[in-house]
């Protein structure tokens, strides 16, 4: 067995009238799944991720921020749902201004989680958040065959409701007529039932190990019921530096009864490969800080009605601004002298606007300059997403 501990904090509060989770359970599920994908034991080896049951593609908005992921497949059987939400995967304006350091291809696919299809080959990680409880037994039986037999990913994450927790929910509201939390649920498993399902998978596919966890902690004095949502993490043994029991099949056959997936939408994100040396990167940052200091100096001159041909920027000030990129006093002074700038009395001499030299516009030397601050508000405005699915 292996373990995984979440760093997401949460608070569960139960009163006489109800129970609340902060943050909401759906956000806790997303946070937990992102942390699983970013686990240092396998993060760098997860390049292609497939999410089954992607629905409104809310989880994608978080997953796309993982720079090591280069291919995301979003799969759902509901074509109309995919069509209504397909534009949500398109790059934002900020993605063009501050592009990724690696490529990202996104495909929206209509298909059944039980069907094997060419688009699923070479998948490194599979995500199925609150999916399995929505399928009938015949589909449920085929899911392990498709994922662990055909896809053979390095990492698989399933989440599903924990029926043990329903004893708390029913203190305040009855379950739905079907006996579950949601009208489309076909079943809700206890922790033992979920564990038995997982044990059956690793017995049939011994190349995998699993760990059980969950989100949505129970209130105090009810710890015995477990979390609202239970999570199974399956990891292929070679990701844990263990020997595989069986060799991987190089190109598994597609089930003849499977219906091929239909590609609904595809998009490729802009990316920028920075080929500059560390020295060139630091020089660009130095130029940006010199330009910023000069503009501030000239603005103060205009306000005071005084004009000078030069201004002096303290090396200490420059160092303070650039320590976060690994700058040292020696490296800064070396760069300044190499680029014919004058250093006197622990200051660099900056010429006025009418005497500008070629270093005056650092942006023409770099397409990827420091623009983070200017983008924060824009990204927040573009990436707001509303309340998610039920807990």
Curated annotation (Swiss-Prot):
**Residues spanning the membrane:** none
This protein's cofactor list reads: Mg(2+)
Q: Which GO terms describe its cellular component?
A: cytoplasm; nucleus
Q: Which InterPro entries does the UniProt entry name for this protein?
A: Hen1 (IPR026610), SAM-dependent_MTases_sf (IPR029063)
Top enzyme class of this protein? Answer: transferase
For this protein, the Enzyme Commission number is: 2.1.1.386
- Catalysed transformations (reactions): small RNA 3'-end nucleotide + S-adenosyl-L-methionine = small RNA 3'-end 2'-O-methylnucleotide + S-adenosyl-L-homocysteine + H(+)
**Region annotation Disordered: residue ranges?**
354-391
For whether the record's keyword set contains Lyase, the answer is: no
Enumerate the residues binding Mg(2+): 130, 133-134, 185
GO annotation terms (biological process)? piRNA processing; primary piRNA processing; RNA methylation; secondary piRNA processing; siRNA processing; transposable element silencing
The positions annotated for binding S-adenosyl-L-methionine are 76
GO MF entries: metal ion binding; O-methyltransferase activity; RNA binding; RNA methyltransferase activity; small RNA 2'-O-methyltransferase activity
Q: How is the cofactor bound?
A: Binds 1 Mg(2+) ion per subunit.
Q: Keywords on this record?
A: Magnesium, Metal-binding, Methyltransferase, RNA-binding, RNA-mediated gene silencing, S-adenosyl-L-methionine, Transferase
Compositionally biased residues, Acidic residues: 374-384
Annotated Gene3D superfamilies: Vaccinia Virus protein VP39 (3.40.50.150)
Keyword set includes Iron: no
In terms of PANTHER family, this protein maps to:
HEN1 (PTHR21404), SMALL RNA 2'-O-METHYLTRANSFERASE (PTHR21404:SF3)
What is the annotated role of this protein in its UniProt record? Answer: Methyltransferase that adds a 2'-O-methyl group at the 3'-end of selected small RNAs. Mediates 2'-O-methylation of piRNAs, single-stranded siRNAs and long hairpin RNA genes (hpRNAs). Methylation protects the 3'-end of small RNAs from tailing and trimming and could constitute a recognition signal for appropriate argonaute machineries.
Family of this protein: Belongs to the methyltransferase superfamily. HEN1 family.
The name this protein goes by in its record? Small RNA 2'-O-methyltransferase
The scientific name of the source species is Drosophila melanogaster
Recorded name of the encoding gene: Hen1
């Amino acid at each position: 067995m292996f373990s995984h501990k979440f760093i997401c904090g949460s608070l569960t509060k139960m009163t006489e009238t109800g129970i609340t989770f902060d943050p909401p359970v759906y956000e806790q599920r997303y946070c937990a799944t992102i942390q699983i994908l970013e686990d240092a034991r396998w993060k760098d080896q997860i390049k292609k991720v497939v999410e089954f049951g992607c629905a409104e593609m809310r989880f994608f908005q978080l997953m796309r921020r993982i720079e090591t992921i280069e291919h995301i497949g979003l799969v759902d059987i509901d074509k109309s749902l995919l069509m209504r939400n397909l534009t949500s995967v398109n790059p934002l304006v900020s993605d063009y201004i501050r592009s990724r350091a690696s490529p990202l291809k996104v495909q929206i696919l209509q298909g059944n989680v039980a069907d094997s299809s060419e688009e699923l080959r070479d998948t490194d990680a599979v995500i199925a958040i609150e999916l399995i409880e929505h399928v009938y037994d015949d589909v449920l039986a085929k899911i392990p065959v498709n994922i662990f037999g055909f896809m053979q990913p390095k990492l698989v994450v399933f989440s599903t409701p924990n029926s043990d927790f329903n004893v708390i929910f029913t203190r305040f509201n009855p379950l739905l007529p079907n006996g579950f939390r949601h009208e489309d649920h076909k079943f809700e498993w206890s922790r033992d039932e979920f564990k038995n399902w997982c044990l059956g998978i690793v017995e049939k596919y011994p190349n995998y190990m699993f760990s059980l966890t969950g989100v949505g902690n129970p209130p105090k004095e009810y710890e015995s019921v477990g979390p609202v949502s239970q999570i199974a993490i399956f990891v292929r043994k070679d990701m844990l530096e263990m020997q595989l029991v069986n060799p991987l099949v190089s190109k598994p056959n597609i089930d003849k009864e499977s219906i091929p997936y239909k590609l609904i939408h595809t998009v490729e994100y802009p990316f920028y490969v920075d080929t500059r040396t560390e020295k060139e990167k630091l020089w660009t940052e130095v130029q940006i800080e010199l330009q910023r200091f000069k503009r501030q100096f000239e603005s103060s001159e205009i306000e005071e009605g005084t004009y000078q041909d030069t201004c002096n920027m303290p090396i200490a000030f420059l160092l303070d601004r650039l320590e976060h990129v690994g700058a040292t006093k020696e490296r800064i002074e070396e760069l300044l002298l190499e680029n014919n700038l004058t250093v006197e009395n622990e200051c660099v001499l900056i010429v006025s606007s009418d005497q500008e030299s070629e270093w005056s516009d650092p942006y023409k030397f770099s397409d990827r300059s420091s623009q983070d601050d200017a983008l924060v508000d824009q990204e927040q405005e573009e990436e707001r997403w509303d309340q998610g699915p039920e807990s």
